[in-house]
């Protein structure tokens, strides 16, 4: 008799995705982040669901409802901080996952890569709207500044912004719709993640060498399930250290002041995971140019497969490209730091140079290094 996990229609899908899935025998710890992202998504949906039970999406009561969750709801404080810091963990895993894809040439799976870019945009949109919900000073002014960027779109910009706001400023209508979208988007992300996996399982996983691994496959369970559980334990430990010892480490003190449209905070800035893009936005003096830089900083990922000039897929055996990759990482860290600094000398010029080098590395230097490495192969 056939095992039920191989015959039952539903169990068969799970079996072919997580148990009997043939996986390359040499995938490293960098391949752990996909499963960790799945765990983060589940954690965010669960904690978010319990927060939504007590949250009130009205400008008058939103701030006090979050305070009520932390003070009066059983274990409300831990649910709230797990949700807030869970977002940070989500983005750490996301950046690692995208970085892995770039380093090892996983972007050659174009469908999987493009769905991944859609997922990245969806997660960023969700996180932005979630940041508005506590209705603190940074929530209100962050929402005002970021949504106002759409007014840079010629002709329809102003109408578009007022349509999104549901009025002539960020107010009750904006908060209510942001809550609605913040609630629904994670479920859309779940569906996209399933499609992401579907496309990945059409081709099979990449591996560090970038070469085909059809001749050397091992079953996903128990080898990679055990490996993923180790990653999960480290993730949970890091999250709980953050939640229990310094839950406000990554937040902004201004968000503990209720939103006040009459008082602008001295430095308006988003959460840390958006700072690199925010720094690019601020480094261009023109409004429309800044908005384009902001969008292109992520959208540039879509053309990375077209800029692949090397005969080798992975960067494992390409020292020149490796140097450029780590230069890009250092560059992004610099941009993240600059995004959190006030707009004054020397931060302005550092931000501009870092923005130029970000696009230069991706669009010019990496394709050139691929061509140089191809020539070096002939020696």
Swiss-Prot record:
GO terms under biological process: mitochondrial electron transport, ubiquinol to cytochrome c
Other remarks in the entry: Heme 1 (or BL or b562) is low-potential and absorbs at about 562 nm, and heme 2 (or BH or b566) is high-potential and absorbs at about 566 nm.
An example molecular function term from Gene Ontology annotations: metal ion binding
Pfam families on file: Cytochrom_B_C, Cytochrome_B
InterPro entries: Cyt_b/b6_C, Cyt_b/b6_C_sf, Cyt_b/b6_N, Cytb/b6-like_sf, Cytochrome_b, Cytochrome_b_C_euk/bac, Cytochrome_b_N_euk/bac, Di-haem_cyt_TM
CC cofactor note: Binds 2 heme b groups non-covalently.
Name of the protein in question: Cytochrome b
Binding residues for heme b b566: 97, 196
Domain of life according to the entry: Eukaryota
Residues holding a ubiquinone: 201
Main location: mitochondrion
Gene symbol of the encoding locus: MT-CYB
Record field: transmembrane: 33-53, 77-98, 113-133, 178-198, 226-246, 288-308, 320-340, 347-367
Function noted in UniProt: Component of the ubiquinol-cytochrome c reductase complex (complex III or cytochrome b-c1 complex) that is part of the mitochondrial respiratory chain. The b-c1 complex mediates electron transfer from ubiquinol to cytochrome c. Contributes to the generation of a proton gradient across the mitochondrial membrane that is then used for ATP synthesis.
Species of origin: Paguma larvata (Masked palm civet)
Subcellular location: Mitochondrion inner membrane
PROSITE patterns listed in its UniProt record: CYTB_CTER (PS51003), CYTB_NTER (PS51002)
GO cellular component: mitochondrial inner membrane; respiratory chain complex III
Protein topology in the membrane: Multi-pass membrane protein
UniProt keyword annotations, A-Z: Electron transport, Heme, Iron, Membrane, Metal-binding, Mitochondrion, Mitochondrion inner membrane, Respiratory chain, Transmembrane, Transmembrane helix, Transport, Ubiquinone
Ligand binding (heme b b562): 83, 182
UniProt keyword Iron present: yes
Quaternary data: The cytochrome bc1 complex contains 11 subunits: 3 respiratory subunits (MT-CYB, CYC1 and UQCRFS1), 2 core proteins (UQCRC1 and UQCRC2) and 6 low-molecular weight proteins (UQCRH/QCR6, UQCRB/QCR7, UQCRQ/QCR8, UQCR10/QCR9, UQCR11/QCR10 and a cleavage product of UQCRFS1). This cytochrome bc1 complex then forms a dimer.
Family affiliation: Belongs to the cytochrome b family.
Necessary cofactors: heme b
CDD domains: cytochrome_b_C (cd00290), Cytochrome_b_N (cd00284)
């Amino acid at each position: 008799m056939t095992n039920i996990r191989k015959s039952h229609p539903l169990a068969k899908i799970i079996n072919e995705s997580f148990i009997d899935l043939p996986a390359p025998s040499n995938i490293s710890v960098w391949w752990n982040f996909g499963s960790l992202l799945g765990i983060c998504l589940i954690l965010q949906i669960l904690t978010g669901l319990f927060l939504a039970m007590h949250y009130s999406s009205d400008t008058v009561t939103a701030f006090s409802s979050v305070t009520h969750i932390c003070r009066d709801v059983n274990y409300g404080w831990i649910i709230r901080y797990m949700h807030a810091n869970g977002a940070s963990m989500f983005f750490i895993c996301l950046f690692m996952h995208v970085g892995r894809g770039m380093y090892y040439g996983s972007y050659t799976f174009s469908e999987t890569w493009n769905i991944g870019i859609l997922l990245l945009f969806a997660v960023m949109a969700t996180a932005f709207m979630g940041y508005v919900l506590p209705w603190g000073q940074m929530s209100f002014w962050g929402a005002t500044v970021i949504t106002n960027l759409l007014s840079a779109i010629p002709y329809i910009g102003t109408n578009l912004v007022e349509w999104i706001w549901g009025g002539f400023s960020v107010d009750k209508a904006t908060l209510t719709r942001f809550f609605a979208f913040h609630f629904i988007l994670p479920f859309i992300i779940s569906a996209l993640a399933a499609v992401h996996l579907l496309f990945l399982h059409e081709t099979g996983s990449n591996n560090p060498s970038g070469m085909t691994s059809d001749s050397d496959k091992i079953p996903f369970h128990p080898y990679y399930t055990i490996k993923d559980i180790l990653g999960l334990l480290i993730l949970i430990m890091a999250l709980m250290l953050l939640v229990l010892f310094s839950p406000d480490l990554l937040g902004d003190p201004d968000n503990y002041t209720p939103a006040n449209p009459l008082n602008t905070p001295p430095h308006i800035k988003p959460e840390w995971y958006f700072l690199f893009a925010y720094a690019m936005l601020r480094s261009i003096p023109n409004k429309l140019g800044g908005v384009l830089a902001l969008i292109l900083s992520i959208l540039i990922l879509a053309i990375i497969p077209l800029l692949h000039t090397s005969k080798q897929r992975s960067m494992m055996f390409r020292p020149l490209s490796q140097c450029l990759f780590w230069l890009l990482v250092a560059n992004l860290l610099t941009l993240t730091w600059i995004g959190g600094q006030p707009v004054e000398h020397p931060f302005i010029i550092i931000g501009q140079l870092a923005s130029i080098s970000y696009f230069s590395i991706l669009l010019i230097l990496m394709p050139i290094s691929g061509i140089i490495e191809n020539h070096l192969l002939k020696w």
